[in-house]
C-alpha cells in the first residue's frame, strides 16, 4: 500500500512537470500558436512575391522579344515620339464658377461690385 502512494506521488509530480513544460517551458503552446501565425503570414508573403516575380519575368520576356513593349515604355516613361509624329498635349480648362453658383464659393463675395485697381 505504501509503494502505491509513492508511485502515485511520482506520477503526479511527473504529470505536473510535463504540464508546466507544456504551458510555460520553451516551445510552449503559446509560442507554437505564435509561430503558426508567422508561418501563415510568411506563406502569404511568399505567394505575393511569387506573383510579383512572375509578373516581372513576363515583363522581361516581353521587353526582350517585343518592340511594342519597348515603344510603350519609351513613350510613357521617357516622353519620346517617333520621327514625323506631332505631339499634342491636352490641357483641361479650370471650371469658372457662375455668379449665382454658391457651391463654388472661393472666399469672393460675388454680390458686391468688383473694384478695379488703378
From Swiss-Prot:
Keyword annotations from UniProtKB, A to Z: Cell cycle, Cell division, Cell inner membrane, Cell membrane, Coiled coil, Membrane, Transmembrane, Transmembrane helix
Residues on Periplasmic side: 25-118
Any single GO BP term: FtsZ-dependent cytokinesis
Pfam annotation, one family: DivIC
One GO location term (cellular component): cell division site
Compositionally biased tracts (Basic and acidic residues): 103-118
Compartment(s) of residence: Cell inner membrane
Transmembrane stretches, start-end: 7-24
Membrane topology of this protein: Single-pass type II membrane protein
Chain spans, region Disordered: 98-118
InterPro entries xrefs: Cell_div_FtsB, FtsL/DivIC
Parts of the chain on the Cytoplasmic side: 1-6
Any coiled-coil regions, as ranges: 30-66
Subunit structure: Part of a complex composed of FtsB, FtsL and FtsQ.
Matches recorded under HAMAP family: FtsB
Function summary: Essential cell division protein. May link together the upstream cell division proteins, which are predominantly cytoplasmic, with the downstream cell division proteins, which are predominantly periplasmic.
Annotated family: Belongs to the FtsB family.
Protein's UniProt name: Cell division protein FtsB
Encoding gene per record: ftsB
Amino acid at each position: 500500500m505504501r509503494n502505491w502512494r509513492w508511485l502515485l506521488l511520482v506520477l503526479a509530480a511527473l504529470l505536473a512537470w510535463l504540464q508546466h513544460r507544456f504551458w510555460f517551458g520553451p516551445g510552449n503552446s503559446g509560442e507554437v500558436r505564435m509561430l503558426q501565425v508567422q508561418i501563415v503570414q510568411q506563406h502569404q508573403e511568399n505567394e505575393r512575391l511569387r506573383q510579383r516575380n512572375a509578373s516581372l519575368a513576363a515583363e522581361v520576356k516581353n521587353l526582350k522579344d517585343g518592340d511594342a513593349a519597348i515603344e510603350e515604355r519609351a513613350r510613357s516613361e521617357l516622353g519620346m515620339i517617333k520621327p514625323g509624329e506631332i505631339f499634342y498635349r491636352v490641357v483641361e480648362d479650370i471650371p469658372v464658377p457662375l455668379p449665382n453658383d454658391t457651391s463654388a464659393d472661393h472666399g469672393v463675395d460675388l454680390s458686391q461690385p468688383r473694384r478695379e485697381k488703378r
